[in-house]
Amino acid sequence: VTTVHTARRRYDMALLRFQARLESPKADRIFPWAVALCLWLVLAVLAVARSKDLGLSSTLGFHLQALHLMESGVSPDVSELGTNIFAQHAAFIFFPIALLTKIFPPTETLLVVQAFAIAIAVVPLWRIGRESANLRIGACSAITLAYALHPSVQNLNLAGFHPEVFALPALLAAYLQGQKERWWTVAVFLLIVVSSRSDLGLAVAALGVVFILEDKQRKGVLVAAIGLSWFLVMAFVVQPAIGNGEYPHLKSFASYGAGSFGVLFGMISDPFSVLGDLFERESFEKVLLLVAPVLFLPLVRMRYLSPVLPLLG
């Protein structure tokens, strides 16, 4: 007769054998890609289904109008925004995405490609956990599950179309490749990051600070300088030239000064106010919302939050 104790032992042994198989190099390579594929399918189906009931935000409409204008050979000036779509965030990654819409239906293409960007982030996240943080399969699985079920991830998938989503896997992959000293590959991923949104140059600069803290001073300084330079050139030269002559988000920085260069001078002359804005209550609550589901995991180190801090001001 099988007792409860015997059944429990059999269950434990079966679980241990399963975990041992997952710890094998082959399973470690395949598992994150399988998870990413499943997550992509789920997110894509949810986003497309949401679009059918007209439940998506206006951001999708902005980019669909821009696509139509670009196909017609006209400047993509979105009527509701009153400016060129690229003047908003200098999201030049939208150009190659637009090429796909010439082959596939525009709405579904934008949503499916966005879902892919969200899902594929699982792979570098897994690799960071396994290689950089030396976590076991169980801990990495918990991180992956926390990411997949995170409210911010689900809301982003169902909130229209946002080119900056493509920066998420690229930023994680850039950090991972930096740990392996593959700097040309890092450069490719960072190009994806900054072409997704101009102010993500600040996130690249913060990633450079992370590299500096990890004894990669020379490369870290270079990455930080490139990220900061990209943001400044895009925000104060390219975006005003494409748009209405000034940085389109100046109202958010009105407390620092008037005009693009007035804001820049105000931020440089009073860095403590900038730091205060980054760590004010609302920004701090954003950080807690982002990391709360994974605070118990050993992967989390406070310096890894630095790439997102510039975006909270």
List where the protein language model places each region:
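Start-transfer (signal-anchor) and selected internal transmembrane alpha helices
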Residues: 1-46, 130, 137-140, 216-223
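Short hydrophobic/aromatic helix or loop-helix immediately within or flanking a transmembrane segment
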Residues: 62-70, 82-106
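Membrane-lumen/periplasm interface segments of specific transmembrane helices
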Residues: 59, 217-309
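Perimembrane helix-loop-helix junctions
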Residues: 13-14, 202-229
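Juxtamembrane segments of multi-pass membrane glycosylation machinery
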Residues: 92-113, 272-283
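Multi-pass, polyprenyl lipid-linked donor-dependent membrane glycosyltransferases
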Residues: 113-117, 142-173, 192-204
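Transmembrane-helix motifs of polytopic, lipid-linked glycan transferases
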Residues: 108-133, 173
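Membrane-interface transmembrane helices that cradle and orient dolichyl/undecaprenyl
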Residues: 133, 166, 171-185, 211-215
